[in-house]
């Protein structure tokens, strides 16, 4: 059996943010030293009730990765409808490298409308069908970024590479897999930093 710790960083008692983060670090250190399998951090924004203390679980996981040796680092969850899918895929891949492969990826659609309205209007929870389509497209792009050497995507919400983008980097050697050698328009996007195991 594997046991993980759900570390929902909250601030019900209105402590200083430094104290809140130090407490989360202490919990992570304890779990690492006592052979817990994983620790999981949440994502919340604009929450005056006390749950706003973890707006970016990847940054928290990066800090914990530098302080621990064995424990796996999870996000419960990355609200992927709020983020650019390529940027999020890169950040998760970078964390996987920094932690030496200890990342557990959790993704979700969000639960608070006030978060969606201020971070990505397309993710508005009043339109659940649209939110679900955005979630599915974002996850598809992230999976492409992690598993394909080169990729392109054209969907309802995102198009990569951007239409009519012209590559003008003189130091890059010509590569027709990457760019149309006649027009210099990108054929694909490259964001691979690591191969994330999808299961």
Say what each PLM segment does:
Residues 1-67, 71-72:
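N-terminal beta1-alpha1-beta2 module of alpha/beta enzyme domains
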Residues 2-4, 38, 70-77, 102-106, ...:
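Structural preference for beta-strand elements that scaffold enzyme active sites
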Residues 5-9, 43, 75-77, 107-109, ...:
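A cross-domain feature marking catalytic cores of carbohydrate-active enzymes
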Residues 48-53, 78-83, 127-130:
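Glycine-rich "substrate-gating" loop/helix at the edge of Rossmann-like oxidoreductase active sites
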Residues 84-199:
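Internal, glycine-rich beta/alpha segment that forms the wall or movable "lid"
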